[in-house]
């Protein structure tokens, strides 16, 4: 049953952890850490906690928030829930691209910040987010146009398909806003400014998505409550754009300008 599946998952995680440590100890000399730690670096631990605690808190509260939104979906009946579940498989197509771009953004930001390449850092955020937006916009439009045959691969029940199509039309055409917003958030996380992104993530969920879902349900539009998802994406995008007006980003821009001026001075010919 459920308890057995949970126990099996826990055992698998511990075995995976133990196997990974043993493999690393045997094959990589630079990773000869003990099975149990004997000490720690206070400065390094503080740096890890500074980034990890806000992100962990964010993920925990975000999961609780999703339960609250799911409760609204459940109020609409099993047919509606089934439709949303099926639609989620189609929107997951765009989700693959978003995950890929977001992973690239956080690595790109961290590497270039560490290397002091501020000019590339500044250009990269524009290039990555634009690429993510264009790709997901195309995916969203194509999947929306052909959503009924795509959704028909998972269910043939007319009522379920109607609910799934409604979900798709409310979410997929606007998925590009989530792609741009999430890439910006990943990029900013890569620079270490996790407090800002944590506040934004909690804001769009607890101040936008959840209230909007319950308001739509209270007004009798519960079967369109998925509109709260697209609304939260748009608000998140605007909020993340606001980061680039903050003093933190201003410092990076000044460093990029100083680096650019230095490179220009080195490459300009000397007049005799």
Regions found by a protein language model. Give the residues of each.
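Alpha-helical transmembrane segments and their helix-entry boundary regions
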Residues: 5-6, 81, 194-198, 224-226
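Alpha-helical transmembrane segments of multipass membrane proteins
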Residues: 21, 67-71, 93, 141, ...
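Hydrophobic alpha-helical transmembrane segments in multi-pass membrane proteins
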Residues: 55-67, 99, 131-140, 144, ...
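Small-residue-rich hydrophobic transmembrane alpha-helices
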Residues: 83-147, 178-200
């Amino acid at each position: 049953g459920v308890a057995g599946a949970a126990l099996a998952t826990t055992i698998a995680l511990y075995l995976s952890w133990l196997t990974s440590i043993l493999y690393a100890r045997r094959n990589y000399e630079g990773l000869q850490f003990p099975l149990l730690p004997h000490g720690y670096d206070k400065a390094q631990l503080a740096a890890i906690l500074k980034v990890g605690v806000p992100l962990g808190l964010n993920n925990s509260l975000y999961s609780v928030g999703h339960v609250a939104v799911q409760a609204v979906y459940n109020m609409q009946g099993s047919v509606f829930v089934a439709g949303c579940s099926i639609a989620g498989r189609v929107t997951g197509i765009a989700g693959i691209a978003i995950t890929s771009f977001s992973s690239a953004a956080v690595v790109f930001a961290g590497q270039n910040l560490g290397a002091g390449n501020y000019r590339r850092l500044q250009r990269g955020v524009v290039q990555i987010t634009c690429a993510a937006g264009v790709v997901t916009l195309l995916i969203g439009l194509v999947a929306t146009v052909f959503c009924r045959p795509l959704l028909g691969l998972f269910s043939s029940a007319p009522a379920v398909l109607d609910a799934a199509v409604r979900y798709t039309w409310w979410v997929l055409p606007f998925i590009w806003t989530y792609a741009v917003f999430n890439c910006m958030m990943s990029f900013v996380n890569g620079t270490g400014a996790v407090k800002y992104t944590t506040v934004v993530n909690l804001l769009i969920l607890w101040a936008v998505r959840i209230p909007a879902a319950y308001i739509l349900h209270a007004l009798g539009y519960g079967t369109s409550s998925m509109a709260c998802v697209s609304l939260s994406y748009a608000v998140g995008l605007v909020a993340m754009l606001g980061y680039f007006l903050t003093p933190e980003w201003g410092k990076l821009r000044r460093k990029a300008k100083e680096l650019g001026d230095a490179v220009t001075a080195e490459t300009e010919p000397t007049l005799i």
